[in-house]
Amino acid sequence: MAALSLKGVRKSYGGAQYVLHGIDVDIADGEFVVLVGPSGCGKSTLLRMIAGLETVTEGEIAIGGRVVNALEPKDRDIAMVFQNYALYPHMTVAQNMGYGLKIRGVERALIDARVQAAAQILELGPLLARRPRELSGGQRQRVAMGRAIVREPSVFLFDEPLSNLDAKLRVQMRLEIQRLHARLATTSVYVTHDQIEAMTLAQRVIVMNRGYAEQIGAPVDVYEKPATTFVASFIGSPAMNLLHGRLSEDGAAFDVADGPRLPVAGSAGAGRGIAPGREWILGVRPEHMTPQPGEAFATLAVDSCELLGADNLAHGRWGAHDVAVRLPHAMRPTRGETLPVALPARHLHFFDPATGKRAG
């Protein structure tokens, strides 16, 4: 195990255009960090640079205090788990898991011992004599993880390992990865576009956008205090409602651009440095919009309602803005019905319209 450090890491492909812009992060020994963002944000490129599969244009990557920029992947003491399992079809599970050690010249007895230990951790013991075609998708991914475990690396790198699995298997594998990290406590960097994976697996999340680390923090902090409108719209399902408009002079109402005046339950700017009487992007999460007894509320004409099982999502519009409200299971408004909706000051987020950055 080892700490991982990235200092001013940048990447370009021979021109002035950078695809990664000065990434700085220190990952502690044993920490599980998730790189999350949409396609093209640079998360997989950054992971490949850590692995040594891409060169570093500028900056420094260090593993265990040793700068690895010039080292080949095999010399970095890392193990990688890919989206595609990359198993040899003619080999058994045991042979697949131990093959990396075999080509490194590790003694057969040690290979067998490590394979057996990894198989016990991943519950692969009964499958060791099978070939990949005889395995389910989840079992194949466990074999790929086992192949990484037997190397006993300083750092695990996961490149969207669950993308090929169905929804039920993804949930199961998330739990298995959590248990694996709790048991091994190996420094891990995990790439995904799925914010549910990011929120459930990470000790810290790095939200990537257009080659920048938009926000770095614990999942709960990123969710509760998004640093930018991008993070607010990307983290959370459904996304945070973002409304362009103006906060009234007394902070008691918000005038939505080309939309209604919405009463605010409490003083919106109190103690937060939110200037009244100016333009803001106001954010509020769908689960925070159900009015409490005695709170001021607005109304929303329901366009549609999604029945999700444990809860429901009502959708409508204020001006040009789509609005989603999370409701209890028993509330199922129909199209055209008017829904009371609150904007509680304690749950409001304000962003600068010019920069998209959080205020207060």
From Swiss-Prot:
One of the record's GO molecular function terms: ATP binding
Protein name (database record): sn-glycerol-3-phosphate import ATP-binding protein UgpC
Keyword Disulfide bond (UniProt): no
Protein function: Part of the ABC transporter complex UgpBAEC involved in sn-glycerol-3-phosphate (G3P) import. Responsible for energy coupling to the transport system.
Lineage: Bacteria, Pseudomonadati, Pseudomonadota, Betaproteobacteria, Burkholderiales
Binding annotation for ATP: G37, P38, S39, G40, C41, G42, K43, S44
Subcellular location: Cell inner membrane
Record keywords, A-Z: ATP-binding, Cell inner membrane, Cell membrane, Membrane, Nucleotide-binding, Sugar transport, Translocase, Transport
EC number: 7.6.2.10
Membrane topology of the entry: Peripheral membrane protein
Chief location: membrane
Phosphoprotein as UniProt keyword: no
Recorded GO CC terms: ATP-binding cassette (ABC) transporter complex, substrate-binding subunit-containing
Reactions accelerated catalytically: sn-glycerol 3-phosphate(out) + ATP + H2O = sn-glycerol 3-phosphate(in) + ADP + phosphate + H(+)
Span of domain ABC transporter: 4-235
Pfam family, one: ABC_tran
